[in-house]
Amino acid sequence: MKKRISRIICTLLCCAPIAISAQTSEKITSPVNLYKEGKELFQEKNYAAAIPALKAFVKQKPTASLLQDAEYMLVSSAYELKDKNRIELLRKYLDCYPDTPYANRIYSLLASCYFYEGKYDEALALFNSTRLDLLGNEERDDRTYQLATCYMKTDNLKEAAIWFETLRASSPKYAKDCSYYLAYIRYTQKRYDEALKDFLPLQDDPKYKALVPYYIAEIYAIKKNYDKAQIVAQNYLSAYPNNEHAAEMYRILGDAYYHFGQYHQAVEAFTGYLDRDHSAPRRDALYMLGLSYYQTKVYSKAAEMLGQVTTTNDALTQNAYLHMGLSYLQLAEKNKARMAFEQAAASSANLQIKEQAAYNYALCLHETSYSAFGESVTAFEKFLNEFPTSPYAEKVSNYLVEVYMNTRSYEAALKSIERIAKPSAQIMEAKQKILFQLGTQSFANANFEQALQYLNQSI
């Protein structure tokens, strides 16, 4: 009997741990505990650890309300962990629960997903379906920053500025970022004083100190504060010689040297710009480099650089052609000079340059013409009619008189004089001589009536 009782007790003792273990396991994997564990981990932002518990809970087929909450935490965790299927999961959740109280946040998460993928129009559409003011403070600020950036990326700068301004006033976290983008927007809008005001405090900020000096220097150059532009550019190049903005800083430095009349330094700076900028260089930089070469008497380089400027019909092109012509004259390439002057004279962008170019064009024609009485006379006539009060008018008149008297083409000379609206005293004196010569020729040819007319006009 005692033996039997002992066996029963032994059996009970052996089975007790198994029963206790089963009860503990059931307690741990019960739907309530799985939900509680998953939710706690989710609230602690331990998303990777929350997912297994929440997935296990969903498999238990819980009540509809708890299932909706659990699946919300699962898709939110997928977003936070940058799951490659996060957009699909978020949209599927909205399809399953169109009336979910979490819809506002889900839309904001979807918008954020599209923002990070660079799909700014899609992101904006979803942000417009979201009430950002209903989100938590930190998330509200994050989404507001994304919304403002989306507007900027889609060129709606007015809306972008409104949202950046709003965020800057309420979020210390994004204050400097907002200041930078507001300054950038003002810069693109050519509101340079406002832009400069926001750029300047960011010069020592670790995130922006290698970026904002470019805009600061550029604004100083635009406002013709070349001394300040020079200082900013020099300091930047000393600190960041290989930065992506170094090329532009060399350009700005060249701009400053050019306007200081320090042409050798300008050539060096602009050369640094061209050596580092492998995209299409700016026309104004090529123009200033070309004129710097001209001022330093490197005429071949001047013509080469200025030739790259003449892509648009404007004042820059007109002056580039003029100085190309002047450079070619120094290189004794008169035909190239003539063609360049002709192009400059054809433009009315700047009448003073047009006048100088027209004079040089006529002079080149005169010096290169194979015909003694040809295109040069026509060019001189045109010049005197267009610029009768020009300081070059006397020289042009003298050239014409020289041609009239040396070629002995008196009838052609007379017609030429008659085409000049306001002939100078020199030309009128030449006209008298020409009429006398025509009169004597007619008399010698026994054309006495014609001779009398010419001689009477010559008196």
Regions found by a protein language model. Give the residues of each.
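Bacterial N-terminal signal peptides
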Residues: 10-17
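Acidic, polar-rich low-complexity tracts and alpha-helical solenoid repeat scaffolds
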Residues: 2-5, 20-459
